[in-house]
């Protein structure tokens, strides 16, 4: 099977008019309008792949998953969680315990950067029964977020006129 290799300048030159097909995985290139608005590309043909735009980017929810960091062998008393600068540090340690194969002890340290727009004073942490440690906290209200609501602007009076009176 012959595969045509295109020069990057000519690749997807008419991108907004021709959406990606199922196997046209284009990584590292910019997004087009149809990537943001998938309903535009679905009207052309049902055989074109639908682009998935993640609507949760502005929802204030972020998630870090790592299966190796499960803490199912630890109780909440064995875990120490603290915020240091812009990081959350997790330390887990339990004393030596006996299991089916002998004695075992576990200890781990993890450190994750917190988002810059997170209200650190109201972060909560919970440990589920299946060993998933969950952090949650609200976003800070930035000046851009607060500008969407109504905000009064005071009007002051100046004693001198700003322009010469017209004759």
Swiss-Prot record:
Cross-referenced SUPFAM superfamilies: HSP20-like chaperones (SSF49764)
One protein family per Pfam: HSP20
Assembly information from the UniProt record: Heteropolymer composed of three CRYAA and one CRYAB subunits. Inter-subunit bridging via zinc ions enhances stability, which is crucial as there is no protein turn over in the lens. Can also form homodimers and homotetramers (dimers of dimers) which serve as the building blocks of homooligomers. Within homooligomers, the zinc-binding motif is created from residues of 3 different molecules. His-94 and Glu-96 from one molecule are ligands of the zinc ion, and His-101 and His-148 residues from additional molecules complete the site with tetrahedral coordination geometry.
PANTHER family to which the protein is assigned, alphabetical: ALPHA-CRYSTALLIN A CHAIN, HEAT SHOCK PROTEIN HSP-12.2-RELATED
One biological process term in Gene Ontology: protein refolding
Signal sequence region: none
GO molecular function: metal ion binding; structural constituent of eye lens; unfolded protein binding
Underlying gene: CRYAA
Protein species of origin: Pelophylax lessonae (Pool frog)
Sequence positions that bind Zn(2+) 3: 148
Keywords of the record: Acetylation, Cytoplasm, Eye lens protein, Glycoprotein, Metal-binding, Nucleus, Zinc
The protein, known as: Alpha-crystallin A chain
Residue numbers of N-acetylmethionine PTMs: 1
Biased composition regions of type Basic and acidic residues, renumbered to the chain: 147-161
Domain sHSP stretches: 47-158
Family: Belongs to the small heat shock protein (HSP20) family.
């Amino acid at each position: 099977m012959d595969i045509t290799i295109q020069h990057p300048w000519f690749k997807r030159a008419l991108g907004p008019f021709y959406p990606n097909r199922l196997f046209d995985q284009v990584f590292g290139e910019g997004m087009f309008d149809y990537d943001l608005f998938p309903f535009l590309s679905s009207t052309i043909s049902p055989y074109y792949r639908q682009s998935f735009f993640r609507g949760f980017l502005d929802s204030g929810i972020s998630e870090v998953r790592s299966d190796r960091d499960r803490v199912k062998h630890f109780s909440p008393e064995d875990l120490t969680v603290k915020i240091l600068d812009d990081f959350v540090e997790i330390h887990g340690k339990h004393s030596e315990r006996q299991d089916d194969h002998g004695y075992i002890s576990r200890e781990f340290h993890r450190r994750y950067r917190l988002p810059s727009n997170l209200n650190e004073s109201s972060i909560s942490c919970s440990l589920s029964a299946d060993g998933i440690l969950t952090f949650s906290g609200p976003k800070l209200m930035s000046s851009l977020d607060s500008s969407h609501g109504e905000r009064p602007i005071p009007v002051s009076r100046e004693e001198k006129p700003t322009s010469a009176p017209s004759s």
